[in-house]
A protein has these predicted regions:
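Charged, low-complexity intrinsically disordered terminal segments
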Residues: 2-140, 149-160, 166-462
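Lumenal/extracellular "mature" regions of secretory-pathway glycan-modifying transferases
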Residues: 142-144
Length: 462
């Protein structure tokens, strides 16, 4: 009898694992195409007869500044704060944000926190500090699409958004998570990234802020955004906040937001859809539209993992005469082994698309997602040039019309190119003046050789 039970349990587990593998691998194979009308309807927000007011912005390009500007937003909020992030960890950078949010809640500010369910389950739900924060009467936390093995077909679809909204007068949005690799100066090795700080000249009247608030309300109220109910008082947020004020006094003085930002002609939010299912490539198609209208395009992305359609789109851009340069991490210092090994497998297809590749070998890996179209349009946010960002995850990008910001970002990319190897479409290589290849450990070479084979059947998930 016992043997029979063990046999049936074993068979049940075996068939469930097959079912799980099918749910994880098969649905993402079917890529959707964009319904332009649906995309437009999703992003449209109403305003009064006076129309939208101009918004001001600045690029935030160091991890220390990224932390400081977040703290300033939190400190000056009077009514509400919204923090949405893909990854939130109970380490120095994450604790800084928890302590600041705790203090804001003590002032009577309503705080809403939305975190992707996988990383929240792995790194956050057991945190005493986070449980203390979530226990505050003015704080509500939710996890987007937490893992549920009864609905395994949803597991692949993650929330990759990263933004912080203060009241109705300002927000910061970009590619940075809420942990030590992105906030503050807590790690020897970290990720370079970019956020955009947006300030409203007329509170509540900026187009992109209205779009972002509307987007947040939709995703916050999804049935898949589950309330975090575990409470606790064992954290150290009160003492940490006092330490925070001593460590970063510049974040706790009044800020002249207009002086610290640059005028823009327009800022528009572009998103993917929000439900945990296959996405139409709304952001990707919008970026391609902007690229096709330009004569010169500069792209920053950590890596490239393209579908057949994505290669075709890039080829259409370059065939129309648009000079297209893409800066990615060199394999030698990339922090994503799947992105690195796919690049080794796909180099010829990338060259055949007619783009110029710059392999960046700086002191740190870059995690930046930016598209510059000519000298006015800058597109910045969380969307990588990979199939996961294009077809599976929620993503956000800001389309910014500002010659000043565009010029600033072009200058930064130009400086980074000195630490790059330039691969031309014909395969010719040219090293920048500061490009130096470090010795690559044999263990890493071996791992990458194995991964180059392993990732082939699963690259549509990467």
């Amino acid at each position: 009898m016992v043997k029979r039970i063990i046999k049936y349990v074993g068979l049940a587990v075996f068939f469930y694992l097959i079912y799980l593998a099918v749910c994880l691998l098969v649905p993402p194979l079917f890529h959707k195409t964009t319904d332009a009308a649906a995309r437009e309807a999703f992003h449209t927000v109403k305003t009064d007869e006076e129309g939208f007011a101009k918004e001001r912005a600045r690029s935030v390009d160091t991890n220390l500044d990224a932390l400081l500007w977040r703290l300033r937003l939190v400190e000056e909020a009077q009514e509400s704060l919204v923090l949405t992030t893909f990854d939130f960890r109970d380490e120095s950078g994450g604790q800084d944000m928890m302590a600041a949010l705790w203090n804001a809640a003590n002032r009577g500010v309503k705080v809403q926190i939305l975190v992707d369910g996988i990383n929240a389950g792995l790194f956050l739900s057991g945190s005493d500090n986070f449980r203390q924060l979530a226990s505050h009467e003015n704080v509500e936390a939710r996890f987007y699409n937490p893992i549920n093995f009864l609905t395994p077909w949803k597991i692949n679809y993650r929330m990759h958004d990263k933004y912080l909204i203060a009241d109705n007068w300002g927000y910061i949005l970009g590619g940075r998570n809420t942990d030590n690799r992105f906030l503050g100066c807590y790690e020897e090795f970290y990720n370079e990234d970019r956020d955009i700080l947006v300030y409203e000249t007329v509170p509540g009247k900026g187009e992109s802020l209205c779009q972002l608030q509307n987007y947040f309300e939709r995703i916050w109220n999804l049935p898949d955004s589950r309330i975090f109910r575990k409470k606790g008082k064992g954290g150290n947020l009160v003492a940490h906040y006092q330490q925070l004020k001593q460590r970063y006094p510049e974040a706790f003085t009044p800020t002249d937001w207009e002086l610290e930002t640059t005028e823009t002609n327009r800022i528009e939010l572009c998103t993917n859809s929000i439900e945990p299912k296959n996405k139409e490539p709304w952001i990707w198609d919008r970026m391609i539209e902007e690229m096709k209208q330009a004569s010169d395009v500069q792209v920053q992305t950590p890596y490239i993992i393209s579908s057949k359609k994505m290669y075709q789109d890039l080829k259409a851009v370059t065939d129309s005469g648009v000079s297209t340069e893409i800066l990615i991490n060199a394999v030698e210092n990339g922090t994503n082994p799947f992105g690195c090994t796919d690049y080794l497998n796909q180099k010829k297809k990338i060259r055949d698309a007619g783009v110029h590749i710059y392999e960046y070998l700086g002191k740190q890996a870059q995690h930046t997602k930016t598209v510059l179209a000519d000298d006015r349009i800058s597109i910045v946010g969380s969307c990588n040039f990979d199939m996961r960002s294009v077809y599976l995850d929620t993503e956000l990008m800001l389309v910014i019309d500002s010659p000043e910001i565009n010029a600033q970002l072009r200058k930064q990319i130009g400086q980074m190119k000195e630490s790059c190897r330039h691969m031309h479409p014909d395969g010719a290589l040219q090293d920048g003046s500061q490009y130096q290849i470090p010795p690559q450990e044999w263990q890493k070479k071996l791992i990458y050789s194995v991964l180059r084979v392993i990732i082939i059947p699963i690259r549509h998930l990467l």
